[in-house]
């Protein structure tokens, strides 16, 4: 992607008009700012929308939520948003986690259990794109299916709450490109892609590379894939640091970056690489406050969970809804940590994974 293409991308993404979604009930709740996409289930075109949350449901609908895992605070915060919103609306919520992106069969069994419950709607944070899509197309069920965070095929999808992971990476790339414009001192980056999803596709990595177009970042070293397990990520980090002592930046997920903070402290390098996380967590919040991390993206995980519950209940209640939405992606630095962003992104410190809500 050349410089003109990058500029076009920014105008296309961010020079947008605002639309208002009006619901037929009054509420004192704060409106949510989202990106509403048309055509549906594509990330290329969106408009900013204001959604006023519904405040109650006409009956205790049964909602079943499936997560890839709750190994880090990203999905924990999504879980909190769902749990809190379900409690506010007086609906039932049953949740389950697959235990990692390699557990396709386990998630498929959990989906079948949702149908056997029986759920009125399924909110699916998938472990795989292609493999699960092919199975879902063969599924004989009229239960509405809503995608959450991770992408799903539009076929058979009633609604979706999520953001473009390509754009999460692109924002990292542009952040680095602005620090190192073409013609300035070259920079070297190590990129840790995290878990290898079954479709073996890294939208984040593609976004980073496109965002770095026409910059002085001359080398991007890609580390190996690895599950969001601290021991796995630590081994990958140590291996790469042993091989490359001249890094300017380390970019990865929140788990990797948290480990890197301690690893770099232990190594006492003369010029340690600076750290960037393409997504957010409680650890990233603390690290930004202390100046240990340069930048982290938040796609507002708590709001993800709230929107998913709100969207499903709207559909079941026959109320107006936007079928394909997502929170705004916000790039956070030490001087951009507002209480509202924290509230919309991170679960309370005392919150534990919750798998059942009864009205």
Annotate the PLM regions.
Residues 63, 82, 172-216, 221-223, ...:
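An alpha-beta-alpha
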Residues 129-167, 178, 281-289, 293-294:
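Flexible loop/hinge segments that line or gate small-molecule binding clefts
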Residues 160-187, 233-234, 280-284, 299-317:
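Hydrophobic alpha-helical segments within soluble ligand-binding/sensing domains
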Residues 121-140, 208, 226-286:
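Hydrophobic alpha-helical
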